[in-house]
Amino acid sequence: MSEYITLSLDEVCALSYQVLTRHGLSDAHARAIAEVITQGQRDECHSHGVYRLLGCVRSVREGRIDPRAEPSLRHVSPGVLEVDAHYGYSLLGFHTGLPILAEKARSQGIAAMVIKRCFHFSALWPEVEAIADYGLVGMAMNPSHSWVAPAGGRQPVFGTNPLAFAWPRPGGQPFVFDFATSAIARGDIELHARQGKPIPEHWAIDADGQPTTDAKAALQGAMQTFGGHKGSALAAMIELLAGALIGDLTSAESMAFDGGVGATPCHGELVLAFDPRVFLGEGYEQGLERAEGLFAAIARQGARLPSQRRFAARARSLEHGVQIPRGLLEDIRGLL
């Protein structure tokens, strides 16, 4: 018997939607979450694919999340939009505010969308790719729970604090990156623990502050930042921009708000959009050519552009479907 089961992308999306609605999420929330989970599985980002359904359901069961919350919008200024998720999942808030964010960026050249009081678990690249689909440059960032120790420290202060960026490219996939400022995403350590696999020593320290290859010990200790003090500084910046600046929780406050329940982190998110046409005016085409020259200079050395591996996985999945570990799929189907 194979350890993996192949599903089509339509089957992944339908299963995700069924699980989510079975546990009380509204149609709008379930569709938004099922879409991004399918995108994660499609692009072989396994820590943000169907595995996340387990956490979604657990968080709803704990009663922290309003599964039927409807986002509300407030125009703070011509260039700033606030989306109040009312303690629902963030994705519906993002999709609700995205068209208005794009309008503001086209009017002002640069615009910000602040999503507040939201529960967030998903990758950010689907969001910045959606901004790039408008022909805009996108950035997104958010804190999480305080799982990550600062460089030189032993106690968790930061979240995994991802940062994502997308640059639209005419006639091709956008230039996209999305990475945690921790050495690895939290979900990757969770998957290693689930599968009984060791982790690289630089990912985390145990509860005694010692480097560890034991994924379960890492989950009880603290994760490390990537790049030492540089990753630590970026993590602090995201705490400030997507926490203090927007009037929402830092990662430490999100952890305190959770109260030991272990639900999806609750915090805010900062999303930025830039319109190249406003910035460049008559030099728009020349600006895009400069960007393409940069990408060509990278690629002709044999270096890989960010997300190329993910785009290749996307093409495979669209043709052949995706493989899901049998045990994980059984756990998910057990939620129905």
Swiss-Prot record:
Record-linked InterPro entries: Mal/L-sulf/L-lact_DH-like_ah, Mal/L-sulf/L-lact_DH-like_NADP, Mal/L-sulfo/L-lacto_DH-like_sf, Malate/L-lactate_DH-like
Native source species: Pseudomonas fluorescens (strain ATCC BAA-477 / NRRL B-23932 / Pf-5)
Keywords linked to the UniProt accession: NADP, Oxidoreductase
Description of how the protein assembles with itself and partners: Homodimer.
Top-level taxonomic group: Bacteria
Protein name (database record): Delta(1)-pyrroline-2-carboxylate reductase
Signal peptide start-end: none
UniProt binding sites for substrate: 52, 160, 186-187
Upper lineage: Bacteria, Pseudomonadati, Pseudomonadota, Gammaproteobacteria, Pseudomonadales
Top-tier EC class: oxidoreductase
GO molecular function, one term: oxidoreductase activity
EC number: 1.5.1.49
